[in-house]
Amino acid sequence: EISCSLVGSEMCIRDSLKGNVGTAWQSQRVEFADLPAPVLFTTNCLMPPAASYADRVFTTGPVAYPGMMHVEAAPDGGKDFEPLIQRALELGGYAAATDTTGTFTTGFGHSAVLGVADTVVDAVKQGAISRFFLVGGCDGARPGRSYFRDFVQQAPDDSIILTLACGKFRFNDLDLGTIGGLPRIMDMGQCNDAYGAIRVAVALA
């Protein structure tokens, strides 16, 4: 679920964009196997595609893989995603409404968070928010790695958790509630969005 009412997003005007499907990088070969849709990789982390979905993989930008269709940028920077769109139409998507593992509000990139900075600062001044924690980083596939989850569960109730990268999948199923209408867990994106988290930290310092 993309946060529109809280922070707004240009993506929210796209009726066909519903949100995020899937979890950490190491699960893609299982999660994509039965996904009735094409998959577009724009950055890390691409694993060697399994035969069950290899014909649905597209890449663009800095990521590519032998045998997969790569969408190149035109001289003006534009990209033609017509082949991907046609593949999506062919596959048709889910035949009926399908629940995955749950619903989690996302879309808190640095521009979105800084767009409501006044609300956040007011909550701090009023004592509703005592501190911010950035819990970000990649995560391995080994079961039992619980540091991220333990940390977040023990964080004070008046704290906000900014998170990014695959480490978030260790705890983003937790319902930590909200503070002043803001979710206590704010998903800022993937590894590549670490710079955005730094910008938010500096702005709110």
Task: Indicate where each model-derived feature is located.
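Single conserved hydrophobic/aromatic residue that forms the stacking wall/gate
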Residues: 1-8, 12-13
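Structural motif
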Residues: 3-4, 31, 124, 153
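Catalytic or ion-translocation cores adjacent to nucleophile or general acid/base/metal-coordination motifs
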Residues: 10, 14-79, 140-203
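Gly-rich Lys/Arg/Thr-decorated short loops/hinges at beta-loop-alpha junctions or inter-strand turns
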Residues: 62-68, 86-108, 129, 183
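Generic structural signal of hydrophobic/aromatic residues within well-ordered alpha-helices
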Residues: 81-88, 113, 120, 151, ...
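Accessory "access/gating" subregions that flank catalytic or transport cores
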Residues: 98-130, 134-176
